[in-house]
């Protein structure tokens, strides 16, 4: 990966990683008889043989720590190619270090907010998980600007865990984009396989979330302002009510789920009835939980979408009626245990 995409010179992965390469032989690629790869060492007994036409390998159960990957090929005459490797110090624009992270716990926090260079939002989420789950009882994944090249790696990263907390940017610029839409197939597969997903997308324009079908959207604040003190009501339990603690200065959405697509769906948070100073009608949903029927006897995992920002990269936004940790406490203690 490019350093510009990952925000540093180190590529962090979990124990699954896919490598892809091109093959070329001037006498024709059909003359390539063997491809070999190795991890960490190029000793004569370290190489693992692949078919001569192999152009990729997905490695799993890689030991945590600093790692290197090597690949070479051999042709029918017994001539070997040069060894190519990752990381490659001659490729100054690419990652210079590859670190494999251990899988900790059954909860994954996904940081899809590359413009938060100080990681204030990640620190806030980590702090909540420290309180709810304990230190070192969860993992986190900083995506940067680009998902892994192979969707296999995206799915593997998710499938190491039972619960995924995926937060996105408070707002984006032309140079930065959320990646969750490109992870759509992996997210759907994760949910349908029994995983639970909480996702907090803010900057979106349509209802085409295959992992959470919506009937319609409404912009709650066409002027781009949602003011401090606004109460976010929970029809589940008023003790879960939240309140805006700092001005939300981006346009945000309310929504109505497409209930026909779910086996069951429930509102967790909604906006209050307008007091005349707001433009919305009724009580638009801003956080909902749904579940799908996978088969006559099996339900999917649960998917929760929250369309108000919990953090803007500087400070939390919904702390005006106690900490927003109570939302995650409710999810982990009630919804994600069923």
Residue ranges and their predicted role:
Residues 1-102:
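Low-complexity, disordered linker/stalk regions enriched in Pro/Thr/Ser/Gly
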Residues 110-112, 200, 306:
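Short hydrophobic segments within beta-strands
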Residues 117-216:
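Helical hinge/lid and interdomain linker segments adjacent to catalytic or ligand-binding clefts
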Residues 170-273, 323, 327:
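A glycine-rich, often tryptophan-bearing local segment used as a flexible ligand/cofactor-contacting loop or short
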Residues 10, 42, 89, 131, ...:
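Coil residues (strongly favoring Ser/Thr
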Residues 102-104, 218, 276-338:
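Extracellular ligand-binding/catalytic regions of CAZymes and related secreted enzymes
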Residues 63, 100-104, 156-160, 190-193, ...:
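Extracellular/periplasmic catalytic domains that process cell-envelope and extracellular macromolecules
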Residues 105-115:
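Short beta-strand segments enriched in small/hydrophobic residues
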